[in-house]
A protein has these predicted regions:
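Conserved hydrolase catalytic core segment
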Residues: 120-157
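Catalytic active-site module of serine/aspartate enzymes centered on a nucleophile-bearing elbow/loop
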Residues: 244-246, 252-280
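N-terminal cap/lid segment of alpha/beta-hydrolase-fold proteins
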Residues: 24-42
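Conserved HGGG/HGGXW glycine-rich cap/lid loop of the alpha/beta-hydrolase fold
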Residues: 39-92
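Bacterial signal peptide processing site
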Residues: 16-20
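Flexible "cap/lid" loop of the alpha/beta hydrolase fold
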Residues: 149-187, 224
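Active-site loop/oxyanion-hole signature of alpha/beta-hydrolase fold enzymes
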Residues: 84-125
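Conserved serine/cysteine hydrolase catalytic core
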Residues: 176-251
Length: 280
């Protein structure tokens, strides 16, 4: 993989990434919707549906949350409460303080949920960078999280392991592409996030976990990238090992943005984890 092909595929890697059978335990009957102050900046959250646990949707880097989860959220709302929010600097949320690391993002999400009155238990569904944030949130608040769905999630070892596959030029172009996003997240922020998540993963709780993986290979310009695909699969398997019984499910017809390509697969995974969480 060389030149433009390397840049194209790795810019993609920066992006995102019927009713249930068991009756839903009762949750708040008036879901919040609006902007709440989080450490001096407004953050938007909107919840739909009723029931527990509450599903919290986490989007990829610089990706609009509404479009990412457009087909997923209404389907999930039919069997439990589901909340979508805009990270600081995105859509209806105001920019937050620097640096923009996973630690900062998850702290803001936790504070936002508290301000909005969205109480645990939670099931987290995180796409791409949102999957990394979900890993950190669950590790830092294990008593509040009852399940996790990782949607083609990033992994804290991706950055250091992928660069040798690219060569000097490809690695440089990748860093530039990753630093160009609507959230103001820098490449340095992403490396710091890797360290934060890597250090926290040992505390990931033993909860139901499904790691969804894209099934359509990255082939920018028609050029296959088997080395990247092999690494990606290894990292998804490692993500699944965060929890006993965690497993990888391949979305055969999807590129990186599985929630947009195969929303039914994402909804099915969330439903399964919610059902398991209710049985715990």
């Amino acid at each position: 993989m060389r030149g433009r092909a390397a840049l194209a595929v790795l810019a993609v890697l920066a992006g995102c990434g019927g009713d249930a059978g068991t009756p839903a335990p009762k949750a708040a009957s008036t879901p919040p919707a609006g902007t709440f102050d989080v450490d001096g900046h407004g953050m938007f959250i909107e919840c739909k549906g009723d029931g527990a646990p509450t599903v919290v949707l986490e989007s990829g880097l610089g990706v609009d949350s509404t479009s990412t989860w457009a087909a997923v959220r209404p389907a999930v709302a039919r069997f439990t409460r589901v909340c979508l929010y805009d990270r600081a600097g995105m859509a209806a949320s105001e920019p937050g303080p620097k640096p923009r690391t996973s630690e900062a993002m998850t702290a803001e999400l936790h504070a936002l949920l508290g301000k909005a009155g969205v109480k645990p238990p939670y099931v987290l569904a995180g796409a791409s960078l949102g999957g990394m944030n979900a890993q950190l949130f669950a590790s830092e608040h294990p008593g509040e999280v009852k399940g996790v769905v990782l949607v083609d999630s990033l992994h804290p070892d991706l950055d250091r392991r992928i660069e040798p596959l690219l060569g000097r030029r490809g690695a440089r172009e990748r860093r530039q592409a990753l630093g160009q996003n609507a959230e103001g997240v820098t490449y340095t922020d992403l490396l710091a996030s890797d360290e934060q998540v890597r250090a926290a993963r040992a505390d990931f709780p033993p909860v139901p976990l499904i790691a969804l993986e894209h099934g359509i290979s990255f082939e920018p310009g028609g050029e296959p990238v088997p080395s990247v695909e092999k690494l990606w699969g290894e990292l998804q398997a490692d993500n699944a090992r965060l929890s006993p019984g965690g497993r990888v499910v391949v979305a055969a017809k999807s590129h990186h943005r599985i929630a947009e390509d195969e929303p039914d697969v994402v909804v099915g995974a969330i439903r399964k984890v919610v059902e398991q969480a209710r049985g715990r």
